[in-house]
Amino acid sequence: MISAGREGAEEAAAERGVDESGRTKLVAISVLTSMDENALRSIGVDGSIKDEVARLASLSYNAGADGIVCSPQEAQEMRELLGPDALIVTPGVRPEGAEKGDQVRISTPSAAIQAGASKLVVGRPITCANNPVEAFESIISELKN
């Protein structure tokens, strides 16, 4: 029973973003995946999205964040910039053929992982699916292949 309790606690901690040491992980949000270059300029940022994500990632990581939230399109550059231990969390992940919705900078689950993502955020393609369990299982199947 103690082992089962410990395993359950470890699983719950993993689901909450707590590592083996019990420390909560902190990731910094960069540029929203719903933003394009025009949207970035409209808030006063003149550089490219990739440059702004890199700037924010460097500032955050150097200040002690464990990683960055960025689109899958910036994941490879962030992995190279921040190194192998950084958490790269990528929203904007959509299975092939899924609706883009308001997301601009998207990728498939397998492409996001190949680009260096540590964690994927897949929301509406699962929650808005006719069969969410089937949608989830399809994504897992894609990742296993």
Residue ranges: model-predicted function:
Residues S60, M78, A112, G123, ...:
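Conserved, mostly hydrophobic/aromatic
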Residues M1-A63, E74, P84-D85, P95-A98:
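Conserved anion-binding
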Residues L82, K119-L120, I139, N145:
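Small-residue (G/A/S/T)-rich helix-start motifs and N-terminal tracts that mark the onset
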Residues R94-E96, D102-A135:
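Glycine-rich phosphate-binding active-site loops on the catalytic face of alpha/beta enzymes
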Residues L26-S30, I68-V69, L87-V93, L120-V122:
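Hydrophobic faces of well-ordered beta-strands that scaffold small-molecule active sites
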Residues E74-A75, I126:
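Alpha-helix capping/helix-boundary segments
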Residues S48, C70, G101-R105:
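Short secondary-structure boundary/capping elements
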Residues I2, R6-G8, A12, I113, ...:
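C-terminal helical cap(s) of enzyme catalytic domains, especially alpha/beta-barrels
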